[in-house]
Amino acid sequence: MSKEKKFEENLADLEVIVQKLENGDVALEEAIAEFQKGMKLSKELQASLDKAEKTLVKVMQEDGTETEME
């Protein structure tokens, strides 16, 4: 099994972090650490989405239809 988490797992982890921070029941140090983890997850999620978009564009171009996605 791959060590890399799936997109859905990372998204769920990010949602837990956001919920913790929104509740405000964490100490400042923990809030900062959670925020940093959340930012890292956010970047990983965005990279996954960008990669998926490029894959779709490539597939669509090979099919001869759409050449650009926005």
Curated annotation (Swiss-Prot):
It is an enzyme of class 3 (hydrolase). Pfam families: Exonuc_VII_S. InterPro entries: Exonuc_VII_S, Exonuc_VII_ssu_sf. GO terms for molecular function: exodeoxyribonuclease VII activity. Its EC number is 3.1.11.6. Signal peptide: none annotated. GO terms for biological process: DNA catabolic process. One of its GO terms (cellular component) is cytosol. Keywords: Cytoplasm, Exonuclease, Hydrolase, Nuclease. It catalyses: Exonucleolytic cleavage in either 5'- to 3'- or 3'- to 5'-direction to yield nucleoside 5'-phosphates. Disulfide bonds: none annotated. It is found in: Cytoplasm. Heterooligomer composed of large and small subunits. HAMAP family: Exonuc_7_S. Bidirectionally degrades single-stranded DNA into large acid-insoluble oligonucleotides, which are then degraded further into small acid-soluble oligonucleotides. Belongs to the XseB family. This is Exodeoxyribonuclease 7 small subunit. It comes from Streptococcus gordonii (strain Challis / ATCC 35105 / BCRC 15272 / CH1 / DL1 / V288). The gene is xseB.
